[in-house]
Design a protein with these regions (language model features):
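Post-signal peptide N-terminal segment of mature Sec-exported envelope proteins
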Residues: 36-64
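Conserved functional acidic sites
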Residues: 55-333
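N-terminal secretory signal peptides that target proteins for export/translocation
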Residues: 1-8
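Sec-dependent signal peptide hydrophobic core
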Residues: 9-16
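C-terminal motif of bacterial Sec signal peptides marking the signal peptidase cleavage site
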Residues: 24-26
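Bacterial signal peptide processing site
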Residues: 28-30
Length: 333
């Protein structure tokens, strides 16, 4: 579970390149994009699992997580025939309009103690066809405090995430290409080992948010990629009033996410405001302790959106160079 997307890694969020001289966020950030990764690739940070209310389960070694779907199922079968207008993502709790950009600001412990942490999400007008379905491309940039320069931010991850909405209003997660950087070594490129695309190596797409939010009493599948031991599940907890820096909202939808294949435990809570999207990320028992709130939200102008498009297409092209799974997809356009 990466972060967050308008939904939302997530968190774990999930999770993507702004350092090519183009930055939207008004803070001190830096990073570099080398042309090739080092030999050794590193795994992304821990995903989340098991709520405090759930019964205890056996601890297993980290290198042998339980590959189980006992805690979530595909309650909505995937069928490409049900996507007549997949790029129109107008779900009340997760609208994705090209040019929408928002920032979640907070803190997380990524192994260096609790540090400041910002994630910038941009809904692009780039299209990526996956399994024959035209998908909306979300550009996700994760900035963390630079250990060598406290008070400044450095790019830790840059990601392309793909979404589509079916005719019943379910928002589907259709894959991710996350590039990772070592912030303890000046932002050195580490590759993109946690890439997943539905239909390749047994990977399954899942739903970010179901269309009928009243039908969410049990856990439902968000994504499953056995080759990288990635399994995310979510359930709907209810609605509430919630306040963040950009405002206070009624009828905020609360979801609970977990990663049953990860023995380390923890849940991630996400909060979606009607007509706005993911305004808050919180945790229950998650060792990473990620807490984020929406600190800004705006609509990009035509020039800004064009600059985003260029960066996203460049990142898409890099995917064919650095990841064998991604190399099996069609180029974005």
């Amino acid at each position: 579970m990466r972060r967050q997307y308008p939904g939302w890694s997530w968190i774990t969020a999930i999770v993507i390149v702004s350092m090519f001289g183009f930055v939207f966020v008004g803070c001190s950030e830096r990073g570099a994009m080398p042309t090739a990764p080092p030999t050794a690739q590193r795994s992304s940070s821990a995903s989340l699992m098991a709520s405090q209310a759930d019964p205890p389960r056996e601890r297993v070694p980290e290198n042998k997580p339980k590959e189980t779907v006992d805690y979530c199922t595909t309650i909505i079968p995937f069928s490409s025939a049900t996507f007549s207008n997949p790029r129109r993502i107008d779900h009340p709790y997760s609208p994705m309009v090209p040019g929408l950009q928002y920032t979640l600001t907070g803190e997380a412990n990524r192994g260096l103690g609790v540090k400041p942490h910002d994630v910038v999400f941009t809904v692009t007008d780039v299209v990526k066809v996956i399994n024959g379905i035209e998908c909306v491309v979300l550009w996700d940039r994760d900035f963390q405090e630079d250990p060598a320069n406290p008070g400044t931010k450095i790019l830790a991850e840059v990601e392309l995430a793909f979404f589509a909405q079916d005719d019943a209003g379910n928002v589907w997660m259709m894959g991710e290409y996350p590039e990772e950087f070592d912030i303890t070594n000046g932002g050195e490129f580490q590759g993109a080992p946690n890439t997943w695309i539905p239909g390749i190596a047994g990977t399954e797409a899942g739903t970010l948010i179901i269309g009928d939010t009243k039908n969410g009493s049990g856990y439902y599948l968000q994504a499953r990629a056995p080759s990288i031991r990635f399994l995310d599940c979510a359930r709907i907890l209810g609605t509430e009033v919630n306040c963040v820096p950009v405002g206070c909202f009624n009828n905020v939808l609360v979801t609970d996410e977990r990663a049953p294949a990860d023995w380390r435990g923890g849940h991630q809570r996400k909060y979606y405001a009607p007509g706005v999207g993911n305004i808050r990320v919180d945790f229950r028992g998650d060792p990473e302790g990620e807490v984020l709130v929406m600190s800004s939200r705006k609509q990009l102008n035509a020039a800004e959106l064009a600059a985003v498009r260029a960066e996203v297409l460049r990142l898409d092209a890099r995917g064919f160079q650095f990841n064998d799974v991604y190399a099996q997809t069609a180029p974005a356009r």
